[in-house]
Structures are given as structure tokens and as C-alpha cells.
Amino acid sequence: MKIEVCIDNIESVHIAQNAGADRLELCACLSVGGVTPSYSLIKSAVDFANIPCYVMIRPRAGDFLFSTQEVNMMLDDIHLAKQLGAQGIVIGALTKHADIDLSVCETLIQAAEGLGVTFHRAFDLCRDPVTSLEQLIQLGCERVLTSGQKASAVEGQPLIKQLVSQASNRIRIMAGAGINAQNAALLVKNTGITELHLSGKGYRLSEMPYHANAVMGENSEDDQKIWRTDFATIRAVKTSVEKY
């Protein structure tokens, strides 16, 4: 059983690895589902971590219908990820009709030659998951992250189980969205998945004794919180699925 932890700061890299993560997904802005991280975060994570680092390739929040300029930006980010020594990338592109954008994905995958490729939860917005999975297999993706096209992986268990059966070891199905120590083992048992994805989000309070009245986040409380991976959450999930 593999545990992938998505992170958006260097503190979380240390915490996730020490808690037992098997792989890191490097992002910025997890609050919007993750976008491409900075040069410095990729470099620092790759230099420090002794587990694989996969870089999110997503130029903005929102949908997964990308312009030509955005595709070119993603190509630049893939080249950077390779240059910095990342082990893989995380991509997803759809057509306006909610099908896999085969042309864009093929272009991105070709640019990533030599790296592992995960197709992210854009899959959960596809109108035909069965056909889409076959297309991702043909494209050469090594795994797809999915919640079973529901708000959480627990709700999406029926489709996840179906996808595991359909994949038949041709591609890995990684479940994500709402994973915790209370549901991880049952999800694995019910669906047959071999990989789990989570952020294990927690926070620590700012160490600054002086707090201005200015608001940088959505509310003043956010200004005093540093969001990061929670060690206990990752360790608990890891422990709960060890027998698998």
C-alpha cells in the first residue's frame, strides 16, 4: 500500500516524509486543489526528500480546459521539473465536452519522457469514466487519482471498485478526497485500491507575538495560522492500512 501526500510548503515535506509518506505531490495553493509550485519549492523538496516527488502541472485554478498559451506554460513547467530532478508530474486536461484532451495530454506526456505521470482529479469531471480510463492507459499514464466522481472517495467507492477491476493492473487507481484513519482501511478493503492520496491538513499557530489588524486571508484568524501536513494524521492512515 502506497501513501501519497500532497503538500504546498517545505515544512510539510519534512513532516510527511517523517510520518511515513511513500511519495509527495508538490503543489501550491492546496485550497484550490493545487496548482504548479514554485521553482524553489520543487528544488528544496527534491534536494531534501528521499521519497519520490511528483510535481503538479496546473497553471491556474478552475476548470481543465486550457488555452494554447497555458499548454505552453505547462510544457515549460515540465521541463523545469525534469531539470530539478523530480521523479514525476501530475497532469490533467479536458475538452469543452468533458472528455480527456488526448492531444494536449499526449504533448505533455511526451515532454515528460522519463518521468512518471499521474492523471489528477480532472478525471472526476469526465463525462465517461470508463472510456476515459482506457484512454489514459493508451496514453501511458501510470496512475489516475480519483474520488470515484463523488465529493469524497468514500461516497465514490462503487466507481472506484469498478475502475480497479477495469484497470486490471494496466494502470494504478489511487483514491483521494476525504481520506483519513477512520475510513482508509475500509476503503482499501471494499475497492481493492493499492494507493491512497491525502493532504492530512493541519496547522500551527504563528510564533509572532505581535498581530496587526490587517487581514491577509479570508478572515483575521487565517493570518495567524500556518497550514501544514499533520504528522499524526499521516501516521494514523499509514498504520491503519499496514496490513494491506
From Swiss-Prot:
Give the matching Gene3D superfamilies.
Copper homeostasis (CutC) domain (3.20.20.380)
Tell me yes or no: is Cytoplasm among this UniProt entry's keywords: yes
Q: What is its main location?
A: cytoplasm
Q: Which compartment or compartments is the protein found in? A: Cytoplasm
Q: Which residues form a coiled coil?
A: none
PANTHER family (alphabetical)? COPPER HOMEOSTASIS PROTEIN CUTC (PTHR12598), COPPER HOMEOSTASIS PROTEIN CUTC HOMOLOG (PTHR12598:SF0)
* Family statement: Belongs to the CutC family.
Protein name, per record: PF03932 family protein CutC
Q: Which gene encodes it?
A: cutC
